Amino acid sequence: MNSLLMITACLALVGTVWAKEGYLVNSYTGCKFECFKLGDNDYCLRECRQQYGKGSGGYCYAFGCWCTHLYEQAVVWPLPNKTCNGK
């Protein structure tokens, strides 16, 4: 019974730690990474994993790379005090 409670608690903790999602952002310009092939996209998957680690995923959503399974402190679009090339 104690083992079952520990397993349940661990699964709940993992779900909260890896819950963040968001657009991949260029930290210098404040712009989202653009993509044109909507849905599963090798470019977005590769860029998300490069920036956030192997555990993350990525696909093209609304012409921007959307990253999934991020850690809570991951930086995603929009950046505070930074607009995309003044737009």
Curated annotation (Swiss-Prot):
Consequence recorded when altering Y71A: Has little effect on the binding affinity to rat sodium channels
SS bond list: C31-C84, C35-C60, C44-C65, C48-C67
Effect annotated for changing L38I: Has little effect on the binding affinity to rat sodium channels
Name of protein: Beta-mammal toxin Css4
Effect noted on mutating N41A: 649-fold decrease in binding affinity to rat sodium channels
Major location category of this protein: secreted
Impact reported for V76A: Has little effect on the binding affinity to rat sodium channels
Protein family (similarity comment): Belongs to the long (4 C-C) scorpion toxin superfamily. Sodium channel inhibitor family. Beta subfamily.
Notes concerning its domains: Has the structural arrangement of an alpha-helix connected to antiparallel beta-sheets by disulfide bonds (CS-alpha/beta).
Effect of mutating T83A: Has little effect on the binding affinity to rat sodium channels
Effect of R46A: 30.8-fold decrease in binding affinity to rat sodium channels
Outcome of swapping Y61A: 1533-fold decrease in binding affinity to rat sodium channels
Signal peptide feature range: 1-19
Species of origin: Centruroides suffusus (Durango bark scorpion)
Modified residues (Asparagine amide): N85
Location(s) in or outside the cell: Secreted
Outcome, altering F63A: 831-fold decrease in binding affinity to rat sodium channels
Effect after changing N81A: Has little effect on the binding affinity to rat sodium channels
Effect of K54A: Has little effect on the binding affinity to rat sodium channels
Annotated phenotype, changing Y28A: Has little effect on the binding affinity to rat sodium channels
